[in-house]
């Protein structure tokens, strides 16, 4: 599973690069917003990425869940922190929230193996 997820992350980055070539101004602006929103500030970057995972779970965006889970892990978020955030998804999103929350936890475990 880890190889498959890493392949998907590579593909996500490739697709973003292709979109950046097709729409350089829009993607440059988007990447600037993403960088500004997720850098350390009053909240550490790891917490911001956990929030992004929670929002991706609520939106049902599987690639977003994978991407932001990998970023949370990169910023040293713990499994316990992710699980707490995912509990809020379950509270607010019911069954669909639980389904995508379980994916986020599985992605974290696989990428952290």
UniProtKB/Swiss-Prot annotation:
Family under the similarity heading: To H.influenzae HI_1053 and P.denitrificans COX locus Uncharacterized protein 4.
Annotated protein name in UniProt: Uncharacterized protein H16_B0147
Segments crossing the lipid bilayer: none
Gene Ontology MF: a single term: peroxiredoxin activity
Domain of life of the source: Bacteria
Gene3D superfamilies per record: AhpD-like
């Amino acid at each position: 599973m880890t190889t498959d997820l890493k392949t998907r992350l590579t593909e996500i980055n490739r697709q973003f690069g292709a979109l950046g070539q097709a729409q350089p101004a829009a993607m440059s602006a988007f990447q600037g917003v993403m960088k500004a929103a997720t850098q350390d500030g009053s909240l550490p970057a790891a917490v911001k990425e956990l929030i992004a995972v929670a929002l991706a779970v609520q939106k049902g965006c599987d690639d977003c869940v994978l991407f932001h889970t990998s970023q949370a892990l990169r910023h040293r978020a713990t499994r316990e922190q992710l699980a707490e955030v995912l509990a809020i998804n379950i509270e607010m999103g019911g069954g669909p929230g639980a389904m995508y929350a379980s994916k986020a936890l599985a992605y974290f475990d696989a990428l952290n193996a």
